[in-house]
């Protein structure tokens, strides 16, 4: 199990540079090292909580969190609980998610300049909270349910959607994603703790590893990296997440 240390550190570092926590990759890694499948979702959610907390702290300090965008997304919390307490066949959902992730990744990597132009137009429109809520409320509800069901925070879908629709620039999207992941993961973990036993003996040592990786990565993303580099990194990470989720089809 010592192999978990460098793998989880790397995942938490790279994902946190863009405000993500790495839940989909934690799942893939834990599957590969032979952790019991029923144990994995709450462990992944717990690690998400650690990384998303420190990522949110760094992006908040850097002034990138937009409450106009983030507050309506918090409707996801009760839906994450519903998803986390629901037992459904996952394979069909995973196929849809993998297609969505690869599509988002391709759009991010191939249309960087168009994204920047779209974001500038949205910024000039200065949409009211009520109009933004028409996008963020249903988005939060859908992604909250999905994230609780699958056992990840949901930011891996949220970030590309916010960027591709022009609602947020990459750093604002990263800050919103970290808050979204944190609240959903807490809700999902609570739901899992009601329906099954949570392996805190496994979680605690791994939490220290991802705490360090998450702190260093999110600090780099919040204060150092440019928007263009963040779009590229998000595109790559979303593609990797798609590959990792696809591995669940064979386990």
Model regions: which residues?
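Membrane-interface alpha-helices at helix entry/exit sites of multi-pass transporters
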Residues: 36-46, 167-178
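Juxtamembrane transmembrane-helix boundary motif
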Residues: 1-16, 27-33, 37, 57-145, ...
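Transmembrane alpha-helices of multi-pass small-molecule transport proteins
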Residues: 43-58
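Transmembrane helix boundary and interhelical junction motifs in multipass membrane proteins
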Residues: 18-26, 151-159
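Short hydrophobic/aromatic, small-residue-rich stretches within specific transmembrane helices
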Residues: 44-48, 177-181, 203-207
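Hydrophobic alpha-helical transmembrane segments of multi-pass integral membrane proteins
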Residues: 172-188, 240
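Short, structured loop/turn "capping" segments at alpha-beta junctions
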Residues: 116, 152-157, 168-172
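Residue positions within transmembrane alpha-helices of multi-pass solute transporters
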Residues: 21-22, 53, 79, 186, ...
């Amino acid at each position: 199990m010592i192999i978990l240390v460098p793998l989880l550190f790397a995942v938490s570092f790279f994902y946190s540079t863009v405000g993500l926590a790495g839940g989909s990759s934690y799942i893939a890694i834990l599957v590969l090292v032979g952790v019991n499948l029923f144990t994995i979702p709450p462990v992944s959610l717990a690690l998400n909580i650690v990384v998303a907390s420190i990522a949110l702290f760094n992006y908040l300090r850097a002034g990138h969190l937009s409450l106009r965008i983030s507050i309506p997304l918090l409707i996801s919390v009760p839906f994450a609980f519903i998803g986390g307490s629901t037992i459904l066949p996952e394979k069909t959902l995973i196929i849809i998610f993998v297609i969505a992730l690869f599509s988002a990744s391709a759009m991010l990597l191939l249309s960087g300049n168009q994204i920047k132009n779209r974001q500038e137009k949205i910024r000039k429109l200065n949409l009211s909270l009520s109009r933004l809520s028409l996008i963020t409320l249903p988005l939060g509800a859908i992604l909250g349910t999905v994230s609780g069901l699958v056992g990840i925070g949901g930011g891996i879908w949220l970030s590309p959607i916010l960027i591709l629709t022009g609602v947020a620039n990459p750093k604002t999207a990263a800050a919103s994603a970290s808050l979204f992941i944190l609240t959903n993961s807490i809700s999902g973990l609570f739901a899992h703790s009601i329906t099954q036993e949570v392996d805190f003996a496994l979680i605690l040592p791994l939490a220290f590893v991802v705490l360090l990786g998450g702190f260093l990565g999110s600090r780099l993303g919040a204060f150092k990296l440019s928007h263009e580099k963040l779009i590229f990194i998000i595109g790559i990470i979303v593609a990797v997440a798609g590959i990792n989720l696809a591995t669940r089809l064979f386990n």
